[in-house]
From Swiss-Prot:
Taxonomic lineage from the root: Eukaryota, Viridiplantae, Streptophyta, Embryophyta, Tracheophyta
Positions bound to heme: C444
Tissue expression: Expressed in the expanding regions of the inflorescence stems, specifically to the epidermal pavement cells, petioles and siliques.
Protein function: Involved in the formation of secondary alcohols and ketones in stem cuticular wax. Catalyzes the hydroxylation of a methylene unit in the middle of alkane molecules to form secondary alcohols and possibly also a second hydroxylation leading to the corresponding ketones.
Family to which the UniProt record says this protein belongs: Belongs to the cytochrome P450 family.
Chief place of localization: endoplasmic reticulum
GO molecular function: heme binding; iron ion binding; midchain alkane hydroxylase activity
Top enzyme class: oxidoreductase
Annotated gene: CYP96A15
Coiled coil: none
Keywords, sorted A to Z: Endoplasmic reticulum, Heme, Iron, Membrane, Metal-binding, Monooxygenase, Oxidoreductase, Transmembrane, Transmembrane helix
Membrane-traversing stretches: 3-23
Keyword Transport belongs to the record: no
Protein name: Alkane hydroxylase MAH1
UniProt subcellular location: Endoplasmic reticulum membrane
Length: 497
């Protein structure tokens, strides 16, 4: 069986690689894929993978915002790509009940288990309600704010001061990932891994998460039998995925075991810890009957999903945000003027231009570039496209933010002013048009905490430091389910006087 799997994998990629190199001669500027016999559109898609995000912009502009991708015969990889706000509103809101994540999503994202990002129906409803109660708990909110403040003071500021003093090159994406990993770990587990330090020690979880996200991305374009064979045999990205998953499981097993021991020894009169791990270990099962606080696997799935979301999305936003500021000094100047004239330590809401600039950054560079859905029953989308039950629909969030038919002829321009109304307040855009925090009933519950955290970090850096991207540094996204920079963001930092 192992040998058969090897030959299936080898032959499949031999054909695809041959076609790929043949297509190297194909001129750019032709976004629509050719439909080949048997392999259909896959060879052309493989050719586009290094620039998949920009390709989706081109193909959706050329096809009136919706495009049907045909994968190899009998492979189960056909997908409908859309950036049509009408379709998005229909799928995520008005006909939400017919569009669960679906069984294919659970297969592809199997490493997340039964976390809130993968479950559907009654279990999702209970997890959503329990998460809502957690994210609106005042103690939890206070823990979020205090952990951000302490990590800024004891982690980010000393690191940036040291880099400025020694005039060394730092990798800002890595810095933000470490900061967010530390703060999300404190908030979700009560444990501070202290990954952000002057020494910048190796972080096993970070590397494991990055590998997992890349492997999950490529699963979307492979038949399930193929990537499962690769995983079983242990080759390619799937081999790395197995190792990464073992690292994650080992880390969370240790944290959960330690906390259970603490809970046993904790006197009944002592207060609970404020973090998510303790909350879910003591969740009220008379209220949330489908939750399993006594099962370590359930706790692992829930907390892993929350830590991953907290680390990856916010760090992605900040990385692209500061890169955009480096390209648009006039925006940086306006931000500093606003901070100097309107800011007080008690009210970040007064910084309207900062909020607008972050929103504009997320429009162009959303942390999650795609959303995957599957209809439970056949349906007809507002665009007129018919979709079968259990078919794959990919909402192209990255492309949505760049559609001229949605955002105007200046859609590719970085203009925070588009988010400011005539009276100087923030302009609201519907979530099916601006999907940085998802849309409909699955809208991100941590939106307000994430925005607060981003503003706190941005404020600290903008007010106290100048930074410069090193000359010749290439900025491009890596193909992944998360919008990360392939080469990071290498900068030098100086402290403002």
């Amino acid at each position: 069986m192992a040998m058969l799997g090897f030959y299936v994998t080898f032959i499949f990629f031999l054909v695809c690689l041959f076609t790929y190199f043949f297509l190297q001669k194909k001129p750019q500027g032709q976004p629509i894929l050719k439909n080949w016999p048997f392999l259909r559109m896959l060879p052309g898609m493989l050719h586009q993978i290094p620039r998949i995000y920009d390709w989706t912009v081109e193909v959706l502009e050329a096809t009136n915002l919706t495009f049907y991708f045909k994968g190899p015969w009998l492979s189960g990889t056909d997908m409908l790509f859309t950036a049509d706000p009408r379709n998005i509103h229909h799928i995520l809101s008005s006909n939400f009940g017919n569009y669960p994540k679906g069984p294919e999503f659970k297969k592809i994202f199997d490493v997340l288990g039964e976390g809130i990002l993968t479950v559907d129906f009654e279990l999702w409803e209970e997890m959503r309600k329990s998460n809502h109660a957690l994210f609106h708990n005042q103690d939890f909110i206070e823990l979020s704010v205090s952990s951000n403040k302490s990590k800024l003071k004891e982690g980010l500021v000393p690191f940036l001061d040291n880099a400025a003093q020694k005039n060394i090159i730092i990798e800002l994406q890595d810095v933000f990932q470490r900061f967010m990993f530390d703060t999300s770990s404190i908030l979700m587990t009560g444990y501070d891994p202290m990954s952000l330090s002057i020494e910048m020690l190796e972080v096993e979880f970070g590397e494991a998460a990055d590998i997992g996200e890349e492997a999950i991305y490529y699963r979307h374009f492979k038949p399930v039998i193929l990537w499962r064979l690769q995983n079983w045999i242990g080759i390619g990205l799937e081999r790395k995925m197995r190792t990464a998953l073992a690292t994650v499981n080992r880390m969370f097993a240790k944290i959960i075991s330690s906390r259970r021991k603490e809970e046993i020894s904790r006197a009944k009169t002592e207060p609970y810890s404020k973090d998510a791990l303790t909350y879910y270990m003591n969740v009220d099962t008379s209220k949330y009957k489908l939750l399993k606080p006594n099962k370590d696997k359930f706790i692992r799935d829930v907390i892993f999903s929350l830590v991953l979301a907290g680390r990856d999305t916010t760090s992605s936003v900040l990385t692209w945000f500061f890169w955009l500021l480096s390209k648009h000094p006039q925006v940086m100047a306006k931000l500093r003027h606003e901070i100097n004239t309107k800011f007080d330590n008690e009210d970040l809401e007064k910084l309207v231009y900062l909020h607008a600039a972050l929103s504009e950054s997320m429009r162009l560079y959303p942390p999650l570039p795609f959303n995957h859905k599957s209809p439970a029953k056949p349906d007809v989308l507002p665009s007129g496209h018919k979709v079968d039950a259990n078919s794959k629909i990919v909402i192209c969030i990255y492309a949505l933010g760049r559609m001229r038919s949605v955002w105007g002829e200046d859609a590719l321009d970085f203009k925070p002013e588009r988010w400011i109304s005539d009276n100087g307040g923030l302009r609201h855009e519907p979530s099916y048009k601006f999907m940085a925090f998802n849309s409909g009933p699955r809208t991100c519950l941590g939106k307000n905490l994430a925005l607060l955290q981003m503003k706190m970090v941005a404020l600290e850096i903008i007010r106290n430091y100048d930074f410069k991207v090193i000359e010749g540094h290439k900025v491009e996204p890596i193909p992944s389910i998360l919008l990360r920079m392939k080469h990071g963001l290498k900068v030098t930092v100086t402290k403002k006087i």
